[in-house]
């Protein structure tokens, strides 16, 4: 669809979302639109520093975890000594951007609101790593902490996965991977999914929404996919197109959050409708007036803070 045929999104978003969009960081260089992925990663990390400030303090530990691909960094956020469960967080960034620093505030708030240990996994980015390496690294980290739970003083009897955007896909894909391959890493009590993509190739919201303001034009989405997948056949893998997986049985309880003006919104709606149709435990909540990636902006947006609280509350209700 031609850009002029799309909705005038920036006129329709909420007042608090407009404030975020109009927030300038004078010390930031311009976005390197034609730069290398390395330059874009560097910019993204710098840009997120402002939004990560002021997060709650808590005990934090970092560990390198062995996988068949090499060492992967993890970061543990421990709000209390006797955590009722452990929640693994997978950051978004289109599979090509992001790290544990860019999503630090999100993980800290999630730990604070749930009172569970949150473990961020710094999976290898694409295109250096191709599907399914990130999922295999996440699963390896889960297995490692399950085996070493006593040494690390964490509760791995009940676990969960959480993620935003591409991280939401990785969160649900990892939970399904554990189920399908019958890997025991503790009971998966819940999965928290904020504005993820789950396998649609086209949709109404993808046609009407997406632009330079969110980095989710049709061309952007194609670029992320080409960086992440190894070959064309991967598009139909049940761990990339999650709608090709069996969503009729033993899916952990899912909290599915949608942003009103997100081109990926129909992915979330379809996931919810599919799970609900097959009596799989799930909850869907739409956050009005929001753009994709709004979870980052809790410094300025009450809605972002609410979305994190909602996810934390859903998870603790499953314990």
Swiss-Prot record:
GO molecular function: carboxylic ester hydrolase activity
GO cellular component, one term: cytoplasm
Subcellular localization: Cytoplasm
Active-site residues, record numbering mapped to chain: 165, 262, 292
Keyword Cytoplasm: yes
Predominant localisation class: cytoplasm
Described function: Displays esterase activity towards short chain fatty esters (acyl chain length of up to 8 carbons). Able to hydrolyze triacetylglycerol (triacetin) and tributyrylglycerol (tributyrin), but not trioleylglycerol (triolein) or cholesterol oleate. Negatively regulates MalT activity by antagonizing maltotriose binding. Inhibits MelA galactosidase activity.
Protein family: Belongs to the 'GDXG' lipolytic enzyme family.
Protein name stated in the entry: Acetyl esterase
Gene designation: aes
């Amino acid at each position: 669809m031609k850009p002029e045929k799309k909705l005038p999104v920036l006129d329709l978003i909420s007042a608090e979302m407009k404030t975020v969009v109009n927030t300038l960081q004078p010390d930031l260089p311009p976005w390197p639109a034609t730069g290398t992925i390395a330059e874009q990663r560097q910019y993204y990390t710098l840009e997120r520093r402002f939004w990560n400030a002021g997060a709650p303090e808590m005990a934090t530990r970092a560990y390198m975890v062995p996988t068949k691909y090499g060492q992967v960094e993890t970061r543990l956020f421990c709000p209390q000594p006797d955590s009722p469960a452990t929640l693994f967080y997978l950051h978004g960034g289109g599979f090509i951007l992001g790290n544990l620093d860019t999503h630090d505030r999100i993980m800290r708030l999630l730990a604070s609101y749930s009172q569970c240990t949150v473990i961020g996994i710094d999976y290898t980015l694409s295109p250096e790593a191709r599907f399914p390496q990130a999922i295999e690294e996440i699963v390896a980290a889960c297995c490692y902490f399950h085996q070493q739970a006593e040494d690390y003083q964490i509760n791995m009897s009940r676990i969960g996965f959480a993620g935003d955007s591409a991280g939401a896909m990785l969160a649900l894909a990892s939970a399904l991977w554990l189920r399908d391959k019958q890997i025991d890493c503790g009971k998966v009590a819940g999965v928290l999914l904020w504005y993820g993509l789950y396998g649609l190739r086209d949709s109404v919201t993808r046609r009407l929404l997406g632009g330079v303001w969110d980095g989710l034009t049709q061309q952007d989405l194609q670029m992320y996919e080409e960086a992440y997948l190894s070959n064309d056949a991967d598009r139909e893998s049940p761990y990339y197109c999650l709608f090709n997986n069996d969503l009729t049985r033993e899916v952990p309880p899912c909290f599915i959050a949608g942003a009103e003006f997100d081109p990926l919104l129909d992915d979330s709606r379809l996931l919810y409708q599919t799970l609900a149709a097959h009596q799989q435990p799930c909850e869907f909540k739409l956050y009005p007036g929001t753009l994709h990636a709004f979870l980052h902006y809790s410094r300025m947006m009450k809605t972002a803070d609410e979305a994190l609280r909602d996810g934390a509350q859903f998870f603790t209700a499953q314990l």
